[in-house]
Swiss-Prot record:
It comes from the Bacteria. This is Chaperone protein HscA homolog. Pfam families: HSP70. One of its GO terms (molecular function) is ATP hydrolysis activity. One of its GO terms (biological process) is iron-sulfur cluster assembly.
Length: 615
């Protein structure tokens, strides 16, 4: 649906005024901007007719160059020429492989990577902002005025920190972000709406630095992402590095190359890769070595990486509950899908030739432009619904270190879910909320996202307060968590922005661990639940004994109940799940008469001095 804008009376825009909106594919290697003009979405070109903008920024003493001009400086001035900044978005310096990069890295106080340039320290958000500025200038020039809004695409596996970094870059560039859109979903818009295709579609997106696989179901204009997978650190750049290492070996070079020679080597490798798209062999010259690279040699180098992408495809299909033969179409996205081996192996895996009718470099930007045109209000009658999913379950910690899932993984977003919790102790006036992410049963095995405290809870007996905790994930995949005590209305809220991003390996490890430890985790959860119940029973009995034990129990009865409590505490520390359960039942039985006497005493106290006829 269109995003509605409210204005003061007499200041609203003309009802049918066409607004300027663009879609931006902010890529690792190249970026594009597209717009809908005369009802047709297409990419926008610069003065030289080029639509691809290299995602490269060169910092000179007094100016900043972006794109082709910056890329020319990469080999000459690598320390001040930043490429593939998207790989570093939302990550800590410790999480970045700096070995093959020519930059001088400096860690900020918050762990964010900074790069030393002639203009001082810059971070990936600032670098990305320069690219977005350049694309926005192109869009404004093509559309004849300032932009009213943009849709920016991100890999489906970008986590909260990476998405927030992208939004921050857009804000630095002075752009109004209508929505962050998953790249595979954007491709589905470009293909699905144009062809009217209904059914299951696999979107295979292999760009310069990231790989995403999305399993989509298209039905009556509704896009549902059934499952996602991929690798946020795998793409055509890795093909270049493998080929560069091979060329270095052929040239007889050993040890680390200086920054300029390393950049030249990567440029040669990229040129050879592009040449092998159409040729069986490509001549090559580097550092005095002359030879050629055949397609079969290149295929042998990259085949393990391509097969890695197919493993992710298999996992995504399993998550969606589908087999390969149920996929009707396979959409190829990203310049790296031009590699013949990629198309061949993907076709074999899905048992059908992949779709390549739309330029794989342009398809994401075109889909983003279509979505931007709708969100800005140029197509108010459009009936298109996008349903993305979250990759890992979101929940919070409960007593005993248990992880209570509030939003399960692969839930479509935007989404809001709420659960009610209560206090554990009498008179409890605060509750600590610990937000976690993951599939395991115990908090210790999940990823901690954020903590906050709800204070001002009215003192009540344990279990009387009702605290409603709401998890809300917006259309950009960002999470906010709020907690409210229902009787008083006191509340607290936090927006979850994880300090650092999760890599694909981390996500896969978390999923694999949840499967491998499923039975062990469930056993641990059942044990923890019984331990929590034992604590509750002991707390309740001790409070009751302190209040009425001396008045209502004989010494022998008190000794018997004390023994039952002591046995329960022993079992709680050393016993099995069943032994703790039996000890709880024994304590309940031992305290049954005491509970009945307390009830009688309470009733007598209430009725004292009352007229029987009025009761």
């Amino acid at each position: 649906m269109a995003l509605l804008q409210i204005a003061e009376p007499g200041q609203s825009a003309a009802p049918h005024q066409h607004k300027r909106a663009v879609g931006i594919d902010l890529g690792t290697t190249n970026s594009l901007v597209a717009a809908v003009r005369s009802g047709q979405a297409d990419t926008l070109c610069d003065e030289q007719g080029r639509d691809l903008l290299p995602s490269v920024v060169h910092y000179q003493a007094d100016t900043i160059r972006v794109g082709v001009d910056a890329k020319r400086e990469a080999a000459l001035d690598p320390h001040n020429t930043i490429v593939s900044a998207k790989r570093m978005m939302g990550k800590a310096l410790a999480d970045i492989d700096t070995r093959q990069q020519p930059y001088q890295f400096v860690a900020a106080d918050n762990g964010m990577p900074q790069l030393q340039t002639r203009q001082g320290l810059v971070n990936p958000v600032q670098v990305s902002a320069e690219i977005l500025k350049k694309l926005a200038e192109r869009g404004a020039a093509a559309l004849g005025g300032d932009l009213d809004g943009v849709v920016i695409t991100v890999p489906a596996y970008f986590d909260d920190a990476q998405r927030q970094g992208t939004k921050d870059a857009a804000r630095l560039a002075g752009l109004h972000v209508l929505r962050l859109l998953n790249e595979p979903t954007a491709a589905a818009i470009a293909y699905g709406l144009d062809s009217g295709q209904e059914g299951v579609i696999a979107v295979y997106d292999l760009g310069g630095g990231t790989f995403d696989i999305s399993i989509l179901r298209l039905h009556r204009g509704v896009f549902e992402v059934m499952a996602t997978g991929g690798d946020s650190a795998l793409g055509g750049d890795d093909f270049d590095h493998l080929l560069a290492d091979w060329l270095k070996e052929q040239a007889g070079l050993t040890g680390e190359l200086d920054a300029r020679l390393q950049r030249e080597l990567l440029d040669v490798a990229a040129a050879v890769k592009h040449g092998l798209t159409d040729a069986d062999a490509v001549p090559c010259t580097f550092a005095g070595w002359q030879g050629s690279v055949t397609r079969s040699q290149f295929d042998e180098l990259i085949q393990p990486l391509v097969k890695r992408t197919l493993l992710a495809c298999r996992r995504a299909l399993r998550d969606a509950g589908l087999e390969q033969e149920e996929v009707l179409e396979v959409v190829m996205v990203g310049g790296s899908t031009r590699v013949p081996l990629v198309r061949e192996l993907v076709g074999e895996f899905f048992q059908r030739p992949p779709l390549t009718s739309i330029d794989p470099d342009k398809v994401v930007a075109i889909g983003a432009a279509i979505q931007a045109d709708i969100l800005v209000g140029n197509k108010p009658d459009a009936e298109m619904l996008l349903l993305d999913v979250i990759p890992l379950s979101l929940g919070l910690e409960t007593m005993g270190g248990l992880a209570e899932k509030v939003i399960p993984r692969n839930t479509t977003i935007p989404v809001a879910r709420a659960q009610e919790f209560t206090t554990f102790k009498d008179g409890q006036t605060a509750m600590a909320i610990h937000v976690v992410q993951g599939e395991r049963e115990l908090v210790a095995d999940c990823r901690s996202l954020a903590r906050f405290t709800l204070t001002g809870i009215p003192p009540m007996v344990a279990g009387a307060a009702h605290i409603r905790v709401t998890f809300q994930v917006d259309a950009d995949g960002l999470l906010s968590v709020s907690a409210m005590e229902k009787s008083s209305g006191v509340q607290a809220e936090i927006q979850v922005k994880p300090s650092y991003g999760l890599g694909e390996d981390d996500i896969l490890n978390m999923l694999s661990a949840s499967i491998a430890n499923a039975q062990q985790d469930m056993d641990a959860r059942m044990l923890a639940e019984q331990q929590v119940e034992a604590d509750r029973v002991v707390e309740s009995l001790n409070a009751a004994l302190a209040a009425d034990g001396e008045a209502l129990l004989s010494p022998a009865e008190r000794a018997e109940l004390d023994a039952a409590i002591a046995h329960l505490l022993t079992m709680r520390s050393t016993g099995t799940t069943n032994q703790i359960k039996e000890a709880i039942e024994a304590a309940d039985a031992a305290s049954g008469e005491f509970a009945a006497r307390r009830m009688d005493a309470s009733i007598r106290k209430v009725l004292t001095g009352q007229n029987v006829n009025k009761v």
